[in-house]
A protein has these predicted regions:
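Residue-level recognition of tetratricopeptide repeat
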Residues: 3, 40, 77, 111-114, ...
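Alpha-helical adaptor scaffolds
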Residues: 6-11, 26-32, 36-104, 118
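Amphipathic alpha-helices of TPR/Sel1-like and other helical repeat/solenoid scaffolds
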Residues: 13-25
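Register position in tetratricopeptide repeats
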Residues: 44, 81, 115, 132, ...
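TPR/TPR-like (Sel1-like) alpha-helical repeat modules
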Residues: 117-138
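Extracytoplasmic/luminal low-complexity segments enriched in Pro/Gly and acidic/polar residues
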Residues: 139-167
Length: 167
């Protein structure tokens, strides 16, 4: 792939070839991967509208349930980057019943709430994500930074996760 942004012809060729792959192999996982590649390239170039379009294309290609969750959380992040907060949070609301995705969904919700300046709500979302990971005996060291950003100590983290409020 051409990553040199000065080489516009090569980038155009890559775009065309990846789109061709999507069109000709739509029923395969390769098409989903190709749409995700185009979405990443769009984000890298600052074109959030194109990234949103490609993420929606990836969803239309019927990826596996696990991949669909990742695509939806990426879509929520792209929408939030474009300050489309209600739409971003609505996507996460649609994933609320997916217990396997609960930690990721809660973390992304916290990130979006932080972008909106809603520190308390973000703290609750991060605490919910942390608690869901703890139930699985998994750790996410990045939460230490996120909790620090919202002013939570380890003891406060546990109490926020146990307060029974949904993020």
């Amino acid at each position: 792939l051409a990553v040199n942004t000065e080489d516009k012809a090569a980038n155009t060729d890559v775009q065309r070839l990846v789109q061709q792959l999507i069109n000709e192999y739509a029923s395969t996982p390769y098409a989903v991967d190709a749409a995700l590649l185009l979405a990443k390239r769009a984000v890298d170039s600052g074109d959030l509208a194109a990234a949103e379009k490609q993420l929606r294309v990836a969803l239309e290609l019927k990826p596996s349930a696990e991949i669909a969750v990742l695509i939806q959380t990426r879509l929520a992040r792209v929408l939030a980057a474009g300050k489309q907060y209600p739409a971003a949070l609505a996507i996460l609301d649609d994933l609320a019943g997916d217990t396997a995705a609960a930690p990721l969904v809660a973390e992304v919700r916290g990130d979006i709430l932080m972008l909106q300046g809603q520190r308390d709500a973000a703290a609750k979302a991060y605490a919910a994500a942390d608690a869901a990971l703890a139930e699985r005996d998994e750790a996410r060291p990045v939460f230490d930074l996120k909790f620090s950003d919202v002013g939570l100590t380890p003891a406060k983290r546990a109490s926020d996760a146990d307060d029974g409020e949904a993020p």
